[in-house]
C-alpha cells in the first residue's frame, strides 16, 4: 500500500536494527483517515471469504481492526492483555510473546464472543515473530471458530513471523513489508495489497 509506505518514510523512526517507531500515526496517535483506508483495503482483500468477526489484540491493533470491521460490517473483538473482573466464565486464553516489549502476556477473550460458526479475520499493527497472531489463532481454535486470514499493517519481513503463520495454514496479507533497516532507512519489499 503505497500510501502507508510513504507515511512510514515520512513519519516513522528506525530504532536500532529491528524496531520501527510509528507513534505519529498508528501506535500512539492515530491517523483515522489512513486507518479507514487500511480497513477498506483489508475488507476488499477478504470480502469473498464470509468473514463474521474481526479479532485483534489491544492496543495498537484496535484502530485498523475497527475500521476493517466497519468496512466488512461485522463485529470487532480485541483480546485483552489483562484479565478484567467481568470476565468470569469460559475465558479463552493464550500466551503471547511481544517482540517489541520483550515480555510474555496472557491474552484473553470472553467466552461466548466467538462460536464455531465464526469465520475470523485477524488484524494487527505489526508482524515480527508471529507470536501475537499465533496466540489469536489458538484462541479462535479454542472457540471452534476458523481463522481465515491475517491482515498486517506493517510486516518486518526479515523476521520469521510470516513463515510461522503460513505454516499454520492461514493466509497473510501485509500492507507494508519491510525488507530491512539500513542506517536508519527503511527498505521495502512489494506489499501484498
From Swiss-Prot:
The keyword Nucleotide-binding does not apply. It catalyses: XMP + diphosphate = xanthine + 5-phospho-alpha-D-ribose 1-diphosphate. It is found in: Cytoplasm. Keywords: Cytoplasm, Glycosyltransferase, Purine salvage, Transferase. InterPro entries: PRibTrfase_dom, PRTase-like, Pur/Pyrimidine_PRTase, Xanthine_PRibTrfase. GO terms for molecular function: xanthine phosphoribosyltransferase activity. The keyword Glycosyltransferase applies. PANTHER family: HYPOXANTHINE/GUANINE PHOSPHORIBOSYLTRANSFERASE, XANTHINE PHOSPHORIBOSYLTRANSFERASE. NCBIfam families: PRK09219.1, XPRTase. Homodimer. Converts the preformed base xanthine, a product of nucleic acid breakdown, to xanthosine 5'-monophosphate (XMP), so it can be reused for RNA or DNA synthesis. This is Xanthine phosphoribosyltransferase. It comes from Streptococcus equi subsp. equi (strain 4047).
Amino acid at each position: 500500500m503505497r500510501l502507508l509506505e510513504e507515511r512510514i518514510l515520512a513519519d516513522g523512526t528506525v530504532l536500532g536494527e529491528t524496531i520501527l517507531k510509528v507513534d505519529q500515526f498508528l501506535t500512539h496517535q492515530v491517523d483515522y483517515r489512513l486507518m479507514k483506508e487500511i480497513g477498506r483495503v483489508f475488507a476488499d482483500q477478504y470480502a469473498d471469504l464470509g468473514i463474521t468477526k474481526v479479532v485483534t489484540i489491544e492496543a495498537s491493533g484496535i484502530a485498523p481492526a475497527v475500521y476493517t470491521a466497519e468496512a466488512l460490517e461485522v463485529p470487532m473483538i480485541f483480546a485483552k492483555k489483562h484479565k478484567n473482573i467481568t470476565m468470569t466464565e469460559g475465558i479463552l486464553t493464550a500466551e503471547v510473546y511481544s517482540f517489541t516489549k520483550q515480555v510474555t502476556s496472557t491474552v484473553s477473550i470472553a467466552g461466548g464472543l466467538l462460536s464455531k460458526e465464526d469465520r475470523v479475520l485477524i488484524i494487527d499493527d505489526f508482524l515480527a515473530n508471529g507470536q501475537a497472531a499465533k496466540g489469536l489463532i489458538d484462541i479462535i481454535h479454542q472457540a471452534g471458530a476458523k481463522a481465515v486470514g491475517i491482515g498486517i499493517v506493517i510486516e518486518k519481513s526479515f523476521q520469521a513471523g510470516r513463515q510461522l503463520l503460513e505454516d499454520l495454514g492461514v493466509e497473510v496479507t501485509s500492507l507494508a513489508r519491510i525488507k530491512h533497516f539500513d542506517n536508519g532507512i527503511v527498505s521495502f519489499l512489494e506489499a501484498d495489497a
